[in-house]
Every structure is written in C-alpha cells, then in structure tokens.
C-alpha cells in the first residue's frame, strides 16, 4: 500500500514537473512570438518616424485645444444672446460674421507670415532676430487695424445694401462699434500665439484661453442676465474678453520668461524689411481669408432660400469648424516642424515632418469623418430641436464625411506650404479653387438646380478635392534644397564652405544678391544635401556669434522716416475715408 502510494506520489510529482516544463516552454514560445512581432513592428516604423510622431502630437494636441478656446469666445456670446429675441440674435450673429470677415480673418492671415519667418529663424538658432520679427509684426498688424476699422464702421450700410432688415442692420452696427476697440487686442493675441507656437510652445495659449473663456462666460452672465444690457452688453463682454486673452498671454510670457532668449528690447531694425514681411503676409492672408470668406458668404446665400436652409447651414458650419480643428492641429504642427527644420538646414527632417504630419492628420480625420457619419441623424440636436433643420443637416452630413477628409489633406498640406514659405502658390490655388471652381459650382447647384445647401457643399467638396490634389503635387515637386536655401536667407544665416569642403551655417545679415553669389546657389548645393542634414538638429551647433537681425538692404534713418511715415499716413487716410463714406451711405440708404 505504501509502495503504491509512493508510486502515485512519484507519478504526480513527475506530472507536475512535466506541466511546469510545458508552461515554461509555452511562456518562452509566447515571449519569442511577441518579441518577433515587436521587432517586425519596429522595422515597419523606423525610430525617426516614431520620434517625429511624438513631436507632432505634442504640438497638434495643444493647438486643437487652444483653437477651441478661441472658437468658444464668440460661440458663448451667441448662446447668451439666444434669449434676447430673434432680431437681437440675428443682429449679433451678423455682427460676428462681419467682424470675422473684415477683422479677425485679416489679422490672423497677416500673422501667418510668422509661420514662415519665425519658425525658420528659430530653427536656425538666430534667436534675437525672432524678437525683431515679432516687433515688425506688431507694428504692421497695428497699422492693419485702420483699413479694418474703415470697413467695420460701414457695417450698417453694407447690410442695408444687401437688403437686410434695418433693425437687424442697426443692431449689428451697434455691436461692431462697441467691438472695434478690441481689434488691436485680437490681432496681438494672434501674433503672440504665432510667436510662441513657432518656437514649439503651445500650452500658454491653452491656459490663458481657458481663463479667458471663464471670464467671458461670467461677464456675459453679468451684462446680459443681471444688468440686462442686451446687444450692447454682449459686445462689451466680447471686447473685454479679447483684451483679457491678449493681456493674460502677455503676462504669462513675462512671468515665465518665455521671451528672454529671443527678446533683446525694441530695436530700430524692426522698421527694416517691411516689404519682405508683407510679401509673405498678404499671400498668407489670402490663403486663409479666401476660404473663410467663402463659407461666410455661403451662410448669407442660404438665408436667401429659407430659414430652414439658413439654420441647417449654420449648424453644418459650426460642426465643420469644430471638426476642422483636428487637422488644423496637424497643419500648425507641420508648419512649425517643417519651418524649424529648413531653418536649421536639415532638409531631410523637413521632408520627414511633412510626410508624418500628412499621414497622422489623415488617419485622425478618417476617425472624425466616421464618427460624423455614424451620428449624422442625431448630431444636429446639439444645436436645435427643429426636425426640418435636423433632417436637412443629416442629408448634408452624408456627403460631409468625404469633404472633411479632403479638407484635412488640403489644410495639412497648406501648413507644409506655409512652413516652406510658398504662400503665394497656396493663395493662387485657393483663389482658383474657391472663386473659379467651388463657389460658382455650389451656387449653381444651390439655386439653378434647387439643391439648397447640399448643392453648396457639393461645390465646396469639388474645391477641396482640387486643393488637396494641387498641394500634394506641389509638395512632391518642391525643390527642397532650394527651399532650404531660401529659409537660410530669411533666417539671416548662410552656408559657408570650409577647408574640408563640408558645409557649415554662419549667421550673417546677407543680402539676397550676396546670397546668390555665395555658396548657397543651386549649383553649389548639388551634393550638399547630405552635408546639410548633419549640420543641426533643431538649431544646435549654429553659433549666435555675429548674428544679424536684419537681412537685405538696410534703409537709412531718413528713408525709414519717409517710408514708414507715409505708411501711417495712408492707413489714417483710409480710416478717414471710411468714416466719410459711412456718413454718406447711411443718409442715402435710409
């Protein structure tokens, strides 16, 4: 009996050992299999791609949040005005549209010149020149307020001319007049944001934007609910909120010393190179404004059909704005990364940033488009309970998913174009795409075929499809070596050939003529691309010794006084002309 028991125990122990061996072998096999999978995944995604994805996401995520904060300022104002009445709500909605078209879009577009100038200069490590570019932007954007004011002061005549209700037009003019002093603050907030984001600093905009929105909600509540100031209270709340955003961000920059590396005090150099700044600023403005204006006009045209079409268009436009913020984050990140790399002379990293940003943005946009498609029948209930509007929005959303994908591609590639400094081609593409293809097609389908806003969005789809195709071809055909040369010139640095025939970067205030005669000519760069890649990783190794803050021909003091004085005089005359025109038109139209 004991022998049988002993045998059984021995047999059990043997079975246990065998099971343990099998478990070990199984675990070992699993680990080998998982390890092999990880190795295969690593081989599919090179290390430099993973690093680039991480860097892009670090920028794109906060950009999305900061843009959402900006959007919420006007959105909250509209929501608070909802209880005032239809006439008041219509007046505020039209006023905000006019402010966006003739004000905010102008400042935001002009500030986009910094997407090229600051990103490339920061990448070159010529840091003090970044501060001078900021000063230049401050002066130019403040002057840009004058023609914007000349348009804004004529809001009522413009609305009366397009047959809006006199009461609505009058309320819109009241709102705009109260908001007008906030325009410089809105412009400065845009410029400060560009100054930081092109250095890879994003979170301050998120933090100050959140604080500004909290203050905006409180002020709207006090002015509209407690004090019952109506439309004037809403405008005053918006004005205070714009100043709070600009002041909060300025204080944060000073508090955290984010300006120390790039700011060397006000310099007379900021009066130089206005032509170079404007040559980038105007196409940048057109790239943004052409698109922005088209959608705003689309809303007005929808109102000519019926209130249902107008309501549906308003909902679709709000949804499109929110959805676009996802690819916008990647567009900004691509612009920053490409500009930084070109300024550092790192051509290959610039191309890598462009590829990774486009792929990541498209993947995220596919997810967003899928979500919109799955919720198309209910998503409009966020904004309204009117069944006719909900049904109309649902019909547009069927097509909008495809529109969003190509809109994302166009937006991200547009960011790459800005980072490379090719805004002129981008502006021409947008003008042709929207005003010669998309908008005429949409309006024809909208009215001639009685398709309403569905026809309008079909026209917009054709536009973004052509846009995305053009930008992809442009980036594919882009001479990246030449783009690197141009970035180095803008950044105030140039290539110098050393004794061992390698290339280095030297900070110089070279003129374009001198640059053409130097080693940075296209012929001199036939074999330089490999050398360029090893020069700098984000600007390291580029000495600031002898750095110049001015590039190109330097104007004398007398020339500066005359030219900048004439610029100021011209802006003041434009504003004066707007005031005189307003007095004449109001009397005539009334």
UniProtKB/Swiss-Prot annotation:
Function: Solute transporter for tetraethylammonium (TEA), cimetidine, metformin, guanidine, N-methylnicotinamide (NMN) and also the zwitterionic cephalosporin cephalexin. Responsible for the secretion of cationic drugs across the brush border membranes.
Keyword Disulfide bond: no
GO-annotated molecular function: antiporter activity; organic cation transmembrane transporter activity; transmembrane transporter activity; xenobiotic transmembrane transporter activity
Keywords for the protein's UniProt record, in alphabetical order: Cell membrane, Membrane, Transmembrane, Transmembrane helix, Transport
GO CC terms, sorted: apical plasma membrane; membrane
Regions of this protein lying in the Cytoplasmic compartment: 1-59, 110-137, 189-199, 255-274, 335-351, 417-430, 474-565
Keyword Glycosyltransferase belongs to the record: no
Membrane topology (UniProt): Multi-pass membrane protein
Organism domain of life: Eukaryota
Transmembrane feature ranges: 60-80, 89-109, 138-158, 168-188, 200-222, 232-254, 275-294, 314-334, 352-372, 396-416, 431-451, 453-473, 566-586
Family note: Belongs to the multi antimicrobial extrusion (MATE) (TC 2.A.66.1) family.
UniProt cross-references to Pfam families, sorted A to Z: MatE
The protein, known as: Multidrug and toxin extrusion protein 1
Listed GO biological process terms: organic cation transport; xenobiotic detoxification by transmembrane export across the plasma membrane
Cell location: Cell membrane
Residues in the Extracellular compartment per record: 81-88, 159-167, 223-231, 295-313, 373-395, 452, 587-590
């Amino acid at each position: 009996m004991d022998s049988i028991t002993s045998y059984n125990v021995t047999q059990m122990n043997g079975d246990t050992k065998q099971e343990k061996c099998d478990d070990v072998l199984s675990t070992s096999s699993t680990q080998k299999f998982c390890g092999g999978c990880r190795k295969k995944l690593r081989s599919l995604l090179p290390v430099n791609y993973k690093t680039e994805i991480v860097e892009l996401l670090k920028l794109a995520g906060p950009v999305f949040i900061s843009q959402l904060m900006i959007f919420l300022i006007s959105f909250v104002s509209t929501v608070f005005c909802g209880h005032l009445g239809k006439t008041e709500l219509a007046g505020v909605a039209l006023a905000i549209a006019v402010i966006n078209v003739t004000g905010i879009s102008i400042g935001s577009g002009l500030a986009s010149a910094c997407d090229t100038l600051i990103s490339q200069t920061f990448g070159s490590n010529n840091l003090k020149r970044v501060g001078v570019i900021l000063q230049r932007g401050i002066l130019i954007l403040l002057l840009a307020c004058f023609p914007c004011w000349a348009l804004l002061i004529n809001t009522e005549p413009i609305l009366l001319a397009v047959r809006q209700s006199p009461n609505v037009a009058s309320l819109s003019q009241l709102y705009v007049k109260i908001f007008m002093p906030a325009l410089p603050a809105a412009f400065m907030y845009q410029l400060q944001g560009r100054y930081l984001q092109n250095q890879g600093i994003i979170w301050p905009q998120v933090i100050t934007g959140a604080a500004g929105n909290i203050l905006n909600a409180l002020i709207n509540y006090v002015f509209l609910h407690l004090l019952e100031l109506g439309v004037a209270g809403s405008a005053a709340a918006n004005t205070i909120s714009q100043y709070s955003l600009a002041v909060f961000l300025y204080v944060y920059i000073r508090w955290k010393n984010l300006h120390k590396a790039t700011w060397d005090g006000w310099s007379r150099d900021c009066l130089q190179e206005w032509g170079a700044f404007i040559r980038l600023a105007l196409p940048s403005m057109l790239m943004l404004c052409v698109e922005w204006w088209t959608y705003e006009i689309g809303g007005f045209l929808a109102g000519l059909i019926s209130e249902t079409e107008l309501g549906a268009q308003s909902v679709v436009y709000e949804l499109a704005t929110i959805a676009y913020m996802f690819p916008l984050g990647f567009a900004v990140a691509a612009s920053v990364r490409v500009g930084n790399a070109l300024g550092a002379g790192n051509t290959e990293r610039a191309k890598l940033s462009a590829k990774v940003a486009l792929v990541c943005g498209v993947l995220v946009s596919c997810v967003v488009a899928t979500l919109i498609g799955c919720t198309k029948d209910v998503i409009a209930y966020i904004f309204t309970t009117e069944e006719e509007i909900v049904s109309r929005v649902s019909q547009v959303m069927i097509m909008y998913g495809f529109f969003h994908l190509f809109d994302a591609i166009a937006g991200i590639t547009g960011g790459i174009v800005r980072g490379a400094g090719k805004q002129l081609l981008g502006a021409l593409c947008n003008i042709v795409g929207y005003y010669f293809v998309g908008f005429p097609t949409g309006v024809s389908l909208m009215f001639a075929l009685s398709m309403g806003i569905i026809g309008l969005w079909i026209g917009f789809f054709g536009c973004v499809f052509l846009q995305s195709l053009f930008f992809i071809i442009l980036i594919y055909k882009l001479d990246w070596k030449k783009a690197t040369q141009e970035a180095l010139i803008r950044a105030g640095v140039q290539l110098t050939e050393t004794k061992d025939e390698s290339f280095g970067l030297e900070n110089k205030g070279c003129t374009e003529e001198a640059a053409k005669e130097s080693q940075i000519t296209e012929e001199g760069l036939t074999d330089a691309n490999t050398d360029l890649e090893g020069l700098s990783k984000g600007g390291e190794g580029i000495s600031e010794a002898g750095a110049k803050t001015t590039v190109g021909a330097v104007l004398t003091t007398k020339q500066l006084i005359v030219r900048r004085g004439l610029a100021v005089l011209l802006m003041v005359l434009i504003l004066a002309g707007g005031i005189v025109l307003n007095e004449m038109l109001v009397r005539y139209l009334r």
